[in-house]
Amino acid sequence: MIRDSLVYWTQNLGVDGFRFDLASILERDQNGNFHQGSQLLWELKNDPGLAGIKMIAEPWDAVGGYRLGYPSKNVGWDEWDAFWDTVRKAVRGDEGQMTALKEAILGSPGIFGSTENGREFSINFITSHDGMTLNNLVSYKHKHNLENGEENRDGHSSEFSFNCGVEGPTLDAEVLELRRKIIRLMHFLLQVSNGIPNDSCRR
């Protein structure tokens, strides 16, 4: 059913790529154990109706699985990796991040095997549909999901965000300029890094 749906969207609706949220579950067997050579991944890789279609894997799943590096190595899928967390922590000044930042800029060769593979398989981004927007990332130190009835329990607690000295909106010109500079720095790192950049925008 998954394969047939992807082929339909590709051939009838013109979709040219798919991102699999919690993709590691696709590598589990009927008992929930990870195994090499997932039948579904093999079928998707070899289906002629999906030839040339971009496949992107999020390397974790809902029950704690983490398979970073496996989809790219086993079936040639692109992958989310640690780029976003690394850049966020490095830019806000966390200690001990320079080696990880270098690895991220090179395209995570430690994960993908080489800088050439990183150029092909590493999906680099600062923000996504999960968590804070780019503007909130430099405006808040903590999440404030207070208006939806969830009492701030929803959403990520480990955003690695930084408020530049003021929590939330401000008219302070120095704080606003610092926020703009940090956003530009993160965009610079995104664009010069080996891999496939996303289209993070300030909102």
Question: For each of these PLM feature ranges, what is it?
Answer:
Residues 1-2, 41:
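Hydrophobic, small-residue-rich alpha-helical packing segments that form membrane-like cores
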